[in-house]
Amino acid sequence: MRDDALSPLTITAPDLLAFHRCQRIPYLNRHGSADDKQDPSAYVGQLRQERQHHQQHIQVQFPGIEVDPTHPEGRSTPALMQQRIHRIYKAHLEVPLPGLETPSNLGDVQLRSQPDGLVWQGSDLEGHYTPVEIRASKRIKPDYELALAFHAFVLGQVQSFTPTTGWLVLQDGAWQTVRLRRWLNRIPTLIQSLGAVVTATEMPDVFMARSRCSLCPWQDFCREHSAQSDPLRLLPGVTRTRHPILVSAGITSIGELAQASVDQLSPLAGLGPKAAVQLVRQAQSTHSQKPVWIRPLEGLEGFDPWPQPVELCFDIEADPHHGVAYLLGVLLIRKGQVIDYHRLMAPDPAQEQQVWESFLTLSEQYPQAPIYHFHAFEVQTCRKLALKHGTAPRRLHRLLKRFVDLHQVVTHGVVLPIESYSLKTIARWLGFEWRLSESGGAQSIFWYAQWLETQDPHFLEWLATYNEDDCRATYRLKQWLAEATPPLALSADLRDLIEPI
C-alpha cells in the first residue's frame, strides 16, 4: 500500500479535522489504494449540498465579494484582502509551513486554508481579517472550532496578525463569535503529529468505533484489516480501554477469551465482574457461533413469548437534523399472520401532526396489542411528538406502556455471535434480508430530502419499502425470541452480574 516516492504535502482544514477524529485517515488518504476507499454515501452528499445551499443563502443575506481568480479584475483572496473588502466569500490562502519541525522525508509542506469567508475587523486604516465557517448544523461542534482555528493560524502568516476569534454561522443564520485561543495553541502540535503519521513506515493503530466510523470511506477497509490482524477488536464489549487490559493478561484471541474464567478476569483493573461476565459470554457465543442464553425471556422488559390476538411492529423514519418525523410505519399481525403494513407518511413536513394523530388512532384500535420496536428511538420520538403536538400525557402513557423494546430483550436475555447488536446485524444473522440492500437510516433521510426537492414519487416508495422491511425484521426477531427455548438460566449470582452489551 505504501508509496515511498512522496510528493510535497498540502494540509487543509478537512485534513486536520480527519486527523483529529482518526489518525489513520490522513495516512490512508496518502498511501491507501483507491480501490479500498468507498465513494461518499448519498447521505454525506446531501449534507454537503445542504451546507452549500446554506452558504448561498447567507451570501445573499449578507452580501460580499466572492473569490474568483479568473475574474478579469483579479479577484484572488490576497488581492481582495489588500482592498480591505468587508466580506470575502470562498477565500483561498496557501502558505508554506512556518518554522515547525517535521520529518526530514516529508518534503515541502503547504497549508491551504479555504474558509467559507473572511470578515474585516477594524477601520479603513487598520484592522485584520477573521475567518468565517458557515454550517447547516443547529449547534456548535468542536470540529467547527478547530477549522476556524486552522484558518486563523494561516491568516496569521498572511496578515502578520493571528485572530483569536472567528465567526460561526449555523442553521439559524445568526453570526456567533467563537474564541479560538485554546485550539490555536494546539494547531502546531496537530500539524507536526499529522506530518509524523503520514511519513511513518506503518499504518497507525486505531480502534474502530461505530459512532465515529459509520460515515468514513475507509470503514470497510479498516474492518477487514481488524478481522485479519486482530479479530478480538471486533468483539462487542471489547472497547479501546478493555482491549489492552485483555492483552496484558495474555488474552489475544476470541478463543482464549472464551476459555477464560470470570474469576480470572474480574480482578483486572478496569474490568470488574460485570464486564468479565459480558466479555466471556460474548466470546463463547462468537467462538461457538451459537447463542448463549443469559436468562429466561418471559416477562423480560415486558416481553411475552406467547402469540397475542393482535400484535403491532412499529418503526419511525425521522430527520433529527431538521426536526421532522416523516414516516411512522406499523405492521399489523393477527394470530401470527402478517395482515397489513400501514405507511403513515408526511409528504410535506407540515403534515407531521396529521401522521402522528393517525398513528395514535390506529394503535388505539387495538388497545391490548403489544407494540414491538427496536431500541429507544421510537419511545424518544413519540415523547417529542406528543410534546410538540399537544398530546394529553395520559394518552401518551397508555401508548408507551404497551411498547416492548426488543433491543433491550436481546441485550438482557441472550448473547449472539455477531459483531454489532443493530437490527440489521441481528436480522441478517436470522436470515432476513432487506429488499433494498443499501438502505439505512441515513439513506432514508436522503430519500426524503430528494422527494421534497424533486417530488419524484419513487423516493417515497423506497422509503416505505425500507420502513416496512424494518418492521418485518423487528417481527422476525420477535418470532425468533418467542420460538427459541433457552436452556436453564445461569445461576442467580451470575445473572445479577450481567450488564447489557
Where are these regions (language model features)?
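Charged, glycine-rich intrinsically disordered N-terminal tails and low-complexity linkers that flank
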Residues: 1-65
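Flexible loop/turn segments at secondary-structure boundaries
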Residues: 35, 319-322, 378-382, 411-413, ...
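C-terminal extensions
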Residues: 43, 222-236, 244-249, 255-356, ...
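Catalytic cores of nuclease domains that cleave nucleic-acid phosphodiester backbones
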Residues: 45-134, 291-324
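Short linear loop/turn motifs
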Residues: 72-74, 261, 279-281, 437-449
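Conserved DEDDh/DEDDy metal-dependent 3′-5′ exonuclease domain
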Residues: 89-99, 112-116, 125-173, 177-197, ...
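Acidic, Mg2+-coordinating catalytic module of metal-dependent nucleases/exonucleases
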Residues: 179-223, 229, 426, 430-495
